[in-house]
Regions:
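Alpha-helical residues within the helix-turn-helix
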Residues: 15, 26, 55
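Extracellular and organelle-lumenal recognition/adhesion modules and their flexible linkers in secreted
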Residues: 60, 71-334, 351, 361, ...
Length: 393
């Protein structure tokens, strides 16, 4: 692109529409000086800015560029070689703030209690209620007594990093005990689906509450933790007003030990566990090709974990700890499975581009992933896909 010719074309188009540089800058959300630099040939607008101006002026991008010739002065239509629309794409890195705090509809932090518990026995990002005993089992003997955590890895997981599969245990000797999380954003009038994998040493009624920053109760309902194995209990809570510093609290007054394997809180209007407003913006971008799960994170990912129910999938501790620490405290919570990713691509009109994990997955396991995605229901993993609600590849 010849910046001088482009600048002259931009100025001509602007003057034809009786726009000042300030007015054009306001329409493009750029300073007036930027418009002047373009017109003097000192700088070049981005393609998105050219596209915006072409719509504004009612012309083509080629008209604004002021030069219809290609390299070496050849006409632009001289080369009839078709270029694949999949030559360029975007990357959905399943780590850091891209999913957790990004496209994921989950609003709770550390919802599977990873890492070492804090000083008072509560997992990081959670606070304890009352002077009771909060702890997370940390030895084989404790797990023998209290049972294994709810979260787990699927077959073929070889990394075995630290404190990925934890649970939060609360022992109450009388009175009220529980745990909570603060600094949550609630939308006014929005319904939130709360789900928890729980069990208890004696049948225990848990009170689940949404609270405002001033301590007022927006909504409160109960679920029951039963003895025996974990069960997922669910209810819907509604926030009566917008609050940027809301709280979720889980409390009980039974003399018992309650074991919480995972918790979830997300708006009921999500799409496969993802935010609809973010997906709408992705549609606007016109993404043609979307890569997932990484990037660097491809070397962390065990695809078969995604075959487990979402709340049961073990978090993944990242070897790129310094990259993930500011976002998710060094862990990823595996919110998106292969099925979810493909559904997202179909929703936004993008071609899915899946990256394998040659570091920890064998060639056979990678081939099984290809089989899961592309083969019919007459194969082992084709049947698994069909059982998950997707009979067609």
């Amino acid at each position: 692109m010849n910046m001088k010719k482009t600048g002259a074309s931009l100025q001509e188009a602007r003057l034809k529409r009786n726009l000042t540089r300030q007015e054009l800058g306001s329409a493009l959300s750029v300073p007036e000086q930027v418009i002047a630099d373009w017109e003097y040939g000192l700088a070049c607008p981005e393609l998105t800015e050219l596209k915006h101006m072409a719509v504004l002026f009612g012309c083509s991008i080629t008209d604004l560029a002021g030069d219809s010739s290609g390299p070496d002065g050849l006409p632009a239509d001289f080369c009839d070689l078709a270029v694949s629309p999949l030559l360029f794409g975007d990357n959905l890195e399943h780590t850091r703030g891209c999913v957790n705090g990004g496209i994921s509809a989950e609003i709770l932090r550390n919802r599977k209690f990873v890492g070492k518990p804090g000083r008072y026995g509560c997992a990081h990002e959670w606070y304890s209620m009352a002077e009771k005993r909060h702890f997370a089992p940390d030895t084989a003997n404790e797990y023998l007594y209290f049972g294994a955590p709810y979260t787990r890895h699927a077959e073929g997981y070889r990394m075995h990093r630290s404190h990925e599969c934890n649970a939060q245990y609360i022992t109450n000797y009388g009175g009220i005990a529980g745990m909570g999380q603060k600094d949550l954003y609630f939308r006014a009038g929005t319904e939130y689906r709360f789900t928890a994998a729980v069990k208890a040493s004696a049948e225990t009624v848990l009170t689940v509450s949404l609270l405002g920053s001033d301590g007022s109760v927006y909504d409160s309902k109960t679920v029951t933790a039963h003895t025996g194995d974990y069960s997922e209990e669910s209810l819907v809570l509604t926030s009566v007003r917008e609050d940027w510093e809301g709280r979720l609290e889980i409390t009980f007054d039974t003399a018992a030990t309650v074991m919480i394997g995972a918790v979830s809180l997300m708006p009921c209007d999500h799409f496969h566990g993802m935010r609809k407003d973010v997906i709408a913006r992705m549609k606007e971008l016109g993404i043609r090709l979307l890569r997932w799960p990484g990037g660097n994170f491809a070397g962390e990912y065990n695809w078969k974990d995604g075959l487990l129910p979402r709340n049961m999938r073990a978090p993944l501790q990242s070897y790129l700890w310094l990259e993930t620490q500011p976002h998710t405290d060094g862990y990823d919570f595996h919110e998106i499975s292969t099925d979810d990713f493909v559904a997202l691509c179909r929703e936004i009109g993008a071609e899915p581009f899946i990256t394998l994990n040659p570091t920890w997955n064998t060639p056979e396991e990678s081939a099984q992933w290809v089989e899961y995605c592309n083969w019919d229901g007459n194969t082992v993993y084709g049947r698994r896909r069909a059982e998950n609600g997707h009979p067609e590849p």
